[in-house]
């Protein structure tokens, strides 16, 4: 997924495109976005990997966990009031940024 898609997506949340920094290319392509409200994670979801209903369900679940007091990324709605926006065929979401340690080798946390 391209930087151009990320830059176009950023504007849907009122994020300045120059504020994006690529941080991961895995299941999603993730950019860190600096905003006046604090850092955000802009996620470009792989087209066709998950349905729109599945992505919305994920946002609803994270919102419910946040409301219940859990420390999880909180979904941000776009300027159009949506949790998921489409840029062409690419679903996009934005979440609050939670700092933390990277997972160890094999995706395990070394504790």
Model-predicted regions and their roles:
Residues 35-111:
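ATP-binding pocket architecture of kinase catalytic cores
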Residues 12-34:
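ATP-binding glycine-rich phosphate-binding loop
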Residues 2-16:
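A short, low-complexity linker immediately N-terminal to eukaryotic Hanks-type protein kinase catalytic domains
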Residues 5, 26-29, 58:
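Short N-terminal amphipathic alpha-helix/helix-capping patch enriched in small hydrophobics
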Residues 2, 18-21, 88:
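Generic detector of short alpha-helix boundary/capping microenvironments
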């Amino acid at each position: 997924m391209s930087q151009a898609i990320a830059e176009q997506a950023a504007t849907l949340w009122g994020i300045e495109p120059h504020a994006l920094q690529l941080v991961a290319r895995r299941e999603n392509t993730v950019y860190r976005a600096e905003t006046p409200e604090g850092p955000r994670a802009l996620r470009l979801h792989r087209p066709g990997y998950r349905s729109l209903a599945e992505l919305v369900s994920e946002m609803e679940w994270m919102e419910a966990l946040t409301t219940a007091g859990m420390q999880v990324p909180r979904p941000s709605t776009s300027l159009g009031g949506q949790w998921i926006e489409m840029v062409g065929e690419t679903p996009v979401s934005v979440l609050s940024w939670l700092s933390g340690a990277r997972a160890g080798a094999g995706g395990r946390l070394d504790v």
